[in-house]
Each structure stands twice: as structure tokens, then as C-alpha cells.
Amino acid sequence: MGQKVHPRGFRLGLSADWQAKWFNEKNYKEWLLEDEEIRKFIKNKYYHAGISEIYVERPDAERINITVKTARPGIIIGRKGAEITSLREELERKFNRRVVINIEEIKTPELDAQLVAESIASRIEKRASYKVAMKRAIMNAMRKGAQGIKVMVAGRLGGAEIARREWYLRGRLPLQKLKAIIDYGTATAWTKYGTIGIKVWIYKGDADI
């Protein structure tokens, strides 16, 4: 029986990059938990900013460099940088380290798998048809230049008694090709019938490796 591997972990160092760049044998567990806390804190605080990924880099034990990839940088930066300054100061108090925050704008959110998954989840939570939400996401991604996209939803779809999963695929999705640039994202929609899981794969072409 075939086993599926995470599309990002499969390509680390080739066409994908690490979300955490540091190594510390002594404080590994502490730093790992801190990284997760940082990501949850920023995602929850700026839920409507369209945050896709948060990278954490630690040049030394006293500094944390955070890079936030977002579709709406203005929400995090704020007027004259007031919001990002407030965020930096809050993180410095929370973790007792010097924090540097960099913001990277996502130019085409339609090609970001995490944002696409969260968009579908949001539509389902607002009682939109899951099929319409999936097809619209696929259409937008292909129109913006994706070479392939797969969207899968699983759960009590449409309030059905028995949970099932459905998926749509458009274009190519070479999951076994290492140099293929495949973006992957997941999200959860909370409905009155239970949770619905969403997975999105987007193929953007091949990396030069």
C-alpha cells in the first residue's frame, strides 16, 4: 500500500525552505515550543491579515528574527508602522529577547495554498456550497498561472449523516517529482455538523536544481 509524504518535507532543501532556521542542542525543546507559540500568537492576533507562513530565525540566543508572509501587510504594519512596533514590543516582553520582524507581501494570494485553503474554510463556515467554493478556488488559481491544483474536503459535507471526502483536480500535479514546486496548505472549517478538513496542493512549475 502506498504511503503519502508531506509535499513540503519531501522537498526541503531543494524547492522548499525550512520555516525555522536555528539549532540548539541544549534548549531545543524550549525554542521549538517558543516558535509554535510565536506563530499561534501572530496568526490569532492578525487573523484577517491573510498570513500564509511565519519563518523564525535565531542568529544567537538573544535574538529572534521573524518573517511574516501576508497578503495584507498594511494590517500588520499599521499607520506609520505603529502596529508592527507594538507587536515587536509585545513579543520582546513575552519572550525576553530582541525581536526583529520582517513583512513579505504575497502578490498573488490565489496561488498560495494556505490562503486558498483558509478561504474555502471561511466560505464553508458562512454556509456557502463547498462545491462552489472549491471550483471557484480552482478557477482563480488556474487563471493566475497555476500549472495544476488539487482541492480536497472531508467531513459531513452538506450536513450528510455519513462523513465522506471529495476532491477536484485541474491541470498537472507531479507529487513524486522532487524539483516540482508544489505549495501545500490545510485548514479546518467549523460547522454546526462538525469540522470539515480542507487540503490544497498547487503546482507552480519546476525549480532550477
Curated annotation (Swiss-Prot):
Source organism, top-level taxon: Bacteria
Supply the alphabetized keyword list. Ribonucleoprotein, Ribosomal protein, RNA-binding, rRNA-binding
Q: Which GO terms describe its cellular component?
A: cytosolic small ribosomal subunit
Recorded hits in PROSITE patterns, A to Z, give: KH_TYPE_2, RIBOSOMAL_S3
Report disulfide bridges, numbered on this chain: none
Which Pfam families does the record associate with it? KH_2 (PF07650), Ribosomal_S3_C (PF00189)
The function of this protein is: Binds the lower part of the 30S subunit head. Binds mRNA in the 70S ribosome, positioning it for translation.
Q: What is this protein called?
A: Small ribosomal subunit protein uS3
